[in-house]
Amino acid sequence: MSQGSATRYPLVLVPGMLGFIRLVLYPYWYGIVSALRQGGATVFAVQVSPLNSSEVRGEQLLARIEEILRETGAEKVNLFGHSQGSLTARYAAAKRPDLVASVTSVAGPNHGSELADYLHKHYPHDSAKGRLMSFLLRIIAALMSLLETSYRGPKLPVDIPASHHSLTTEGVRLFNQ
């Protein structure tokens, strides 16, 4: 077996908004986990709240990191965040740098999301359109939770306004301070 993907510390893959580990038969990290493992890496795809603030998701990630460290005996992990998972990973690394060797951000809204800004402007949470969008997102999150076939932990909280604000330019500006 090739050791081309082996790392000193386990890789922890952190999904973005509405992320999952496996939705029925479709893995979020399609092909990536198996390819990295074939290359010799120790890999964990984790689940955090699909719709919540980067800070809440980050605290959930920290709890999972501590479990992974106990399970593997490793001193640290390498975090690999996709989309909002990048902010989640950055939060965990900032709060507990002693547990995190590196953070890789893939398509992370590290300066905010134009889409989140657009939705904030045109679909305010207290408007009829905003309430409808929140309702639809809650339904989507609930359906995804029912169809998730790999996560076996406690039900994760959903906070759509916090999730949305975390991705706006203003929300990320505050996060980056």
Can you annotate each of these PLM segments?
Residues 1-2, 101:
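Generic signature of intrinsically disordered, low-complexity, basic-rich segments
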Residues 2-41:
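Short, surface-exposed "cap/lid" segments of acyl-processing enzymes
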Residues 15, 43, 59-176:
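Serine-dependent carboxylesterase/thioesterase catalytic core
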Residues 19-20, 51, 111:
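Active-site loop signature of alpha/beta-hydrolase-fold enzymes
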Residues 25, 53-58:
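Phosphate/oxyanion-binding active-site loops and adjacent basic polyanion-contact surfaces
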Residues 31-52, 104:
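Conserved alpha/beta-hydrolase
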